[in-house]
Amino acid sequence: VFWNFHERQPGEFDFSGQADVAEFVRLAQEEGLYVILRPGPYACAEWDFGGYPSWLLKEKNMVYRSKDPRFLEYCERYIKALGKQLAPLTVNNGGNILMVQVENEYGSYAADKEYLAALRDMIKDAGFNVPLFTCDGGGQVEAGHIDGALPTLNGVFSEDIFKIIDKYHPGGPYFVAESYPAW
């Protein structure tokens, strides 16, 4: 889910037409598919500005991907709006959303556990009552992992996944969030 697709203007959310992510999730359920939701707020995915809305650039001296209070306020507004659309569609509510990701590859950027904890709490407070997870490369799990979220790895599957995940969550589950067969 890309934040900039749903909040093109500050405080104005669009979940209609092509932006109707709830309809997409329901369609997946009709087809017998489950959804692993990755709401960001930073999505990366080689998407413009990592999925952040461009209007954030007007905020002078605001630090992105941090516990900057202004940034967190905008993140919370977005996560709450997304929760109204999608939290009713979790598997615990009869839907098909299995898991929700907290941030994206944060360990390669910084190690601000307070920021990650704030996002984790926002996601829970928005009604997402399914397991949460983080995803990082093997060498960045320490910085990107947060209590209350399963650590997952990005990259190519190898035996190292067991050792790395066991360090933070003994016994798994073992999950490669992004598999790179070629780059």
PLM feature spans:
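Substrate-binding/catalytic cleft of secreted carbohydrate-active enzymes
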Residues: 37, 42-74, 82-183
